[in-house]
UniProtKB/Swiss-Prot annotation:
Subcellular location: Cell inner membrane
The protein, known as: Octopine transport system permease protein OccM
UniProt source species: Rhizobium meliloti
Transmembrane region(s): 12-32, 57-77, 96-116, 163-183, 199-219
The encoding gene: occM
Membrane topology, from the record: Multi-pass membrane protein
């Protein structure tokens, strides 16, 4: 098939229409999932089994099953229960957008909870004990000691989860949502040129994730002053402790 720059350009422009929906799914699912994940992480680090066990089971279930299966269960499966069809949740569960958003949020919460749990457990126990010895209240302890250090530790892993969620929005096309991949599938059925269409779609996802990765890199740079590269080369005198003005 001959190379057609005009077709690529027209395809690229057509796929841009799916970016707003993809971003809405990614941003809102990450926001909801983060709130749920923080609650799950606190339950996981709790010493009470009746808090730890439900969180552990939730994380196991959603990490151990494919996201596509979860989307299908929520969109196609829940509608077979008469109680749900007559409940206040039905106006949301009958809409593909809310089903996709819910599945994405529940899925990312399971992964993010483990990332947050690792960040919380990475805080040195000595600092926590010292803060308690100084009479620091639990809320203040979390706000000034635990949370700032936990955020720094979990940020690299959390940035990877955000990138994965941006790509996972493509699965929303399986339940009729016309985001980037949904529009791409429609164009392929009309043009029978899957290579060019999916190449354009992949370029859009790559650009979106590049921007997201750069934003997280900027946040990491601002949170780790000691990791910033100095503009002036460090010479031998500096290493010996001499100060140059």
């Amino acid at each position: 098939m001959p190379f057609d720059p005009l077709f690529l350009w027209e395809t690229f422009i057509a796929l841009l229409a799916g970016i707003p929906l993809a971003l809405k799914l990614a941003v809102f699912s990450i926001a909801v999932g983060t709130v749920l994940a923080f609650s799950l992480a606190l339950m996981r680090v709790s010493r009470r089994w009746w808090l730890d066990f439900p969180a552990r089971f939730y994380i196991f279930a959603f990490r151990g099953t494919p996201l596509l299966v979860q989307i299908y269960i929520i969109y196609y499966g829940l509608s077979q229960f008469p109680g749900l069809r007559h409940s206040l949740l039905w106006p949301f569960l009958r809409e593909a957008y809310w089903c996709a958003l819910g599945a994405l949020a529940l899925n990312t919460a399971a992964y993010s909870a483990e990332i947050m749990r690792g960040g919380l457990l990475s805080v040195p126990a000595g600092q926590i004990e010292a803060a308690r010895a100084c009479g620091m209240a639990r809320v203040l302890l979390f706000r000034r000691i635990i949370i700032p250090q936990a955020i720094r530790q979990m940020l690299p892993g959390y940035s990877n989860e955000v990138v994965l969620m941006v790509k996972s929005t493509s699965l929303a096309s399986t339940i009729t949502l016309m985001e980037i991949t949904g529009i791409a599938a429609k164009l392929i059925s009309e043009t029978y040129r899957p290579v060019e269409v999916f190449a354009c779609a992949g370029a859009i996802y790559l650009t979106m994730n590049f921007i997201a990765a750069r934003l997280f890199a900027l946040i990491e740079w601002s949170l780790w002053p000691e990791r910033r590269k100095t503009r002036r080369p460090v010479d031998l005198a500096d290493q010996k402790g001499e100060l140059h003005v």
